[in-house]
Design a protein with these regions (language model features):
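Short glycine-rich phosphate-binding loop at a beta-alpha junction
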Residues: 93-104, 202, 261-276
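Structural motif
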Residues: 7-10, 101-104, 148-150, 271-276, ...
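Conserved phosphate-binding loops in N-terminal lobes of ATP-dependent enzymes
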Residues: 11-100, 230
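Phosphate-binding glycine-rich/basic clefts of nucleotide- and phosphate-handling proteins
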Residues: 160-243, 273-276
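Helical "lid/coupling" subdomains associated with nucleotide-phosphate turnover
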Residues: 221-336, 345, 363-366, 371-373, ...
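Forkhead-associated
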Residues: 351-440
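Small-residue (GG/TT-enriched) beta-loop-alpha framework at ligand/catalytic clefts
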Residues: 99, 108-195, 254, 273-275, ...
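Gly/Thr-rich phosphate-binding beta-strand-loop-beta motif of the actin/hexokinase/Hsp70
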Residues: 1-25, 29-32, 138-168, 185, ...
Length: 440
């Protein structure tokens, strides 16, 4: 019988059997005098009991004493152990487990994890890097980055793939996790309620918890829709507000940029489903392939014989055989200075840029543009790029730190453009198009 697999990502710990997910639970714990609330129930009371709530015991897996004394747990390792016991029970008590873990885990944390498992009623038979396992299921030869988001940070894993998938580097972006995304959303939504219904949901713990409980639904809705209706009940009163997609993307822009700016331009991106579920993020990357939640488990199932080992000191696997039937292939990438476009040898000179159905003429004097706002003044601190036209043709120059894209490829400072090319921005669905206007 195939082993069960536990993916340790505290934004949603997942358990799979034979490649199919059977359990999902977040890495939250609320300490009570005589019990510990874990998982989703703990997450849904985190803002009701903030001092008793813990959500960093997986990311900071250690034996340092908890800040709040409790007879139920002494340190983060105790909380992790208690959650593993609960997961084992909820997942029909598997005898053997393979763990997939993020590249952010240190040797000491991996050793501590295996020590914790020795006190659990199951046996750990494998330990593998989550990014490596996911890529081994789908990716063909090339250079990739695997990007995944946890509760409090994002992990970018560099992978080289030939006959094998090999981890070559790990970059951790702190303070850029699901909780940071939700905190940003909560602040924006609270402001909207104050503006639209004179109600502040963050003034009381119960309504603040209700706000946070609904944020995942709001984000899913805005993946495909331009707006979402917000509602929070307080007593017998139903408070409502409306959230539009574009202001949300602007609010999340700084979080998105932390990740985008850390991605090497020459790499193909393998994007976890957690990031794919954030509105506008997938459009921020020029060469990206979304991964399903099951992908990492399929990689483990395909390579279980390689991953499995015996004894208390398991080998941490950071290289696996590459799939012979890849669903993802690296794509030829144009240099940032000259993004690829179709029929570039026949492309007409761009004379105008089409913004919100209005054509703006290009000339020697730069035209300054901002995502979602269109043409702005040269002195506008929020300008994102400038466009100008010379004898050599039209070109786009980045202004400020926001990543700018031409035809889906991020530019490096400046790039030429022709009629038919598109202009985009990190963290925004805004797309402007260059056109050639014929004069007679």
């Amino acid at each position: 019988m195939a082993s069960s697999v536990i993916e340790l990502n505290d934004s949603e710990i997942r358990v799979a059997r034979e490649g199919e997910i059977i359990l999902r639970t977040p890495g939250y714990a609320v300490l009570q005098p005589d019990a510990i609330i874990l998982g989703e129930n703990a997450e849904r009371s985190a803002h009701l009991n903030p001092r008793q709530t813990h959500s960093r015991y997986w990311s900071n897996l250690n034996q340092d004493a908890l800040s709040v004394h409790s007879s139920q747990a002494r340190h983060n390792a105790d909380l992790a152990w208690r959650q593993l016991l609960a997961i084992h029970e909820q997942a029909d008590r598997p005898d053997e487990v393979i763990f997939t873990v993020p590249g952010s885990y240190s040797r000491e944390q991996l050793s501590l994890l295996l020590g914790i498992v020795q006190s659990c009623p199951f046996t750990a038979v494998g330990l593998v890097d989550s990014a490596v396992a996911g890529a081994a299921a789908v990716a063909g030869p090339g250079r990739y980055v695997h990007i995944d988001m946890h509760l409090h940070y994002t992990v970018i894993t560099r992978l080289d793939i030939g006959d094998a998938v090999t981890r070559t580097g790990v970059h951790i972006i702190e303070d850029c996790g699901i909780t940071d995304i939700h905190d940003t959303c909560a602040g924006l939504i609270a402001d909207l309620f104050i503006q639209q219904s004179r109600f502040d949901p963050q003034r009381q713990a119960e309504t603040e918890q209700s706000l946070y409980d609904q944020i995942p639904h709001y984000l899913r809705t805005l993946l495909e829709n331009e707006e979402v209706q917000l509602e929070i009940r307080h007593g017998n009163t139903r408070h409502q507000a409306r959230l539009f997609r574009e202001p949300l993307l602007r609010a999340l822009q700084s979080q998105y940029e932390k990740i985008i700016n850390a991605v090497p331009a020459e790499y193909t991106c393998l994007l976890s489903d957690r990031l794919c579920n954030l509105p506008g993020f997938i459009q921020s990357l020029g060469n990206v392939h979304p991964l399903r939640a099951e992908t990492v488990f399929h990689g483990c199932r395909m390579n279980e014989a390689v991953i499995r080992s015996s004894g208390p000191a398991l080998q941490f696997v950071t290289s696996l055989p590459a799939t012979r039937t890849p669903a993802v292939q690296t794509e030829p990438r144009a240099t940032p200075a000259a993004p690829r476009r179709e029929d570039s040898d026949k492309a007409a000179t761009a004379t105008h840029v089409l913004i919100n159905h209005r054509a703006h003429a290009l000339g020697a004097s730069p035209l300054y543009v901002a995502a979602g706002e269109g043409v702005v003044r040269a002195s506008d601190p929020h300008r994102h790029c400038s466009i100008s036209l010379s004898d050599r043709g039209a070109s786009v120059r980045q202004e400020g730190e926001l990543a700018v894209y031409v035809n889906g490829h991020r530019i490096d400072g400046q790039a030429p453009v022709s009629a038919g090319d598109t202009l985009g921005f990190a963290g925004s669905d805004t797309v402007y198009r260059f056109i050639h206007v014929v004069t007679r």
